[in-house]
Every structure is written in C-alpha cells, then in structure tokens.
Amino acid sequence: SLSPFLIAKYEVTQAEYAAVMTGHATLSVTPSFFAGDDLPVEQVSLDDLKEPDGFLGRTGLSLPSEAQWEYACRAGSTGPFAGNGLLDDMGWFSENSEVRTHDVGTKQANDFGLHDMHGNVNEWCEDVYSEDFYASELAYGPDPLSTEGFVSRVIRGGYFLANGEDVRSANRESAFPNLRNFSVGFRPVRLPAPLP
C-alpha cells in the first residue's frame, strides 16, 4: 500500500529546470543534448539532483519510489501500457520518435492525467536497484522502497530509442547515479499538504 503522494503531470522541462537552477555555481542550467524549453530536461544525474543545492534541494521535492512511479504510470490499468493501451498514442519510443525527445504533453495522458509515462526519457526513481526486490517481503509492505543492493538506481519508463517491450509499465532498468545521458530525465513527487 502507498501513502498519498502528488506526482508531476509531466517530466521536468528544460525551461523549468533552468528557472530553478539559475545561479548554480557548478551545475549547468542547460545540460540537455536536445534543446527546447518544452522538451524534457536530460543529462542530469541522480547525484546532480540530490546535491544540497541541486534541483530537489532547491524545490523541496523528491523523486518517486519505484512503487509510486509504477502506480502513477498504470493509473489503474493492468495491461502493458496505460490509457487506451495503444503505445503509439501514449508515448515516444523507437517506432515513432524520429530519434529525438519531444515536447512534454504531446501524447495522450493516462487515466490519472499524467503524460509521457511511456518513453520520451527514462525517469530517475529513489530506489536502489535490486533485481530480485519484488521477490522479497519488503516489496509488499507499506510504501515499499529498495534501499539494499548495488550502487545502481532504478530508472523507469523507457526512452525515445527503446522498443515497445522496454517502455511497458512494468519494465525496470538501472543506471549508475552519476550517469548523465540524453536518455534520462526525471519527474518529481511531493507529499500532499496536511488538511487543516
């Protein structure tokens, strides 16, 4: 079971990233390989995001756990792809991307109103990658989070060069936390404000 959380409707765009990171002493405000205000920011490592003066520190936001990410992606669906189940309608992948990222929100939203959960760019998650995490009891407790294992971190969603198999709701990948690559961006979460 998951506690309530809020997740961004879109992957963080280059314009949003630049607005938050302006004036940073060492990190680039425009790190992306593909340039465009409404394109997802990429080439931002997990280490960059988590440094004290990084995007997450400056905004007070967090990365989703893998469980939060998959719950948000599926939006109640049980098939391989959310929404109407047709990948071409839901995301950018190898067969329709023209070998590049695309402006966020140009494909259909899933039933939670979230865009680009399939393809465009992979998205960092909070979890340490463990190949057999879902075979453990921890995966089925409240607010599951993998903290044990190798140094690699979970990335989800697939990206614009991935095949259909690799952008499924359930597909899991990993990356070293210092990776800066045009295939990886992020979508933050936060806890809802307490009721008065």
Task: Report each predicted region and the residues it spans.
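Surface-exposed recognition segments
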Residues: 77, 97-100, 117-196
